[in-house]
């Protein structure tokens, strides 16, 4: 298998560090080997220079974005490509959504999850006991 996730204009990435953690961005321009210019139309992140080490490249690419494309062009092509929906439907997006949902639980929510897991385990063990008998 060849590597297909290149740092290129139009590539969608996920910020993995800092104040914009877990936000999707589009690479607009490559400044040097360590820094890139990114823009995020859907998350309210204005055009910003970010270190390459602080992003994780996704397999999603917005087509026909030239280096240094204007903000309006990036926004229109981002929405046309349905990047947010595509990422949310991916395994990576589902995992992040699940993690955020669990982190937002209060004490009673965690208790309900624990009780549900106990009921599930009890039902599985009961069926297993029937099969063994």
From Swiss-Prot:
Keywords: Ribonucleoprotein, Ribosomal protein. Signal peptide: none annotated. Gene3D superfamilies: 2.30.30.30, 6.10.250.2270. Pfam families: Ribosomal_L14e. GO terms for biological process: ribosomal large subunit biogenesis; translation. SUPFAM superfamilies: Translation proteins SH3-like domain. It comes from the Eukaryota. CDD domains: eL14. GO terms for cellular component: cytosolic large ribosomal subunit. The keyword Coiled coil does not apply. GO terms for molecular function: RNA binding; structural constituent of ribosome. Belongs to the eukaryotic ribosomal protein eL14 family. This is Large ribosomal subunit protein eL14. It comes from Griffithsia japonica. The gene is RPL14.
């Amino acid at each position: 298998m060849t590597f297909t996730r290149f740092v290129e204009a139009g590539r969608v990435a996920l910020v993995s560090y800092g104040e914009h953690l877990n936000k999707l961005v589009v690479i607009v321009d490559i400044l040097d080997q360590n820094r890139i210019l990114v823009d995020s139309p859907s998350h309210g992140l204005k055009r910003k220079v970010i270190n390459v080490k602080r992003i994780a490249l996704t397999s999603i690419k917005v087509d026909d974005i030239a280096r240094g494309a204007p903000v309006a062009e990036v926004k229109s092509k981002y929405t046309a490509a349905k990047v947010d929906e595509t990422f949310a439907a991916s395994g990576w997006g589902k995992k992040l959504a699940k993690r955020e949902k669990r982190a937002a639980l209060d004490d009673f929510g965690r208790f309900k999850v624990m009780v549900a897991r106990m009921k599930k385990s009890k039902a599985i063990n009961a069926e297993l006991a029937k099969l063994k008998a």
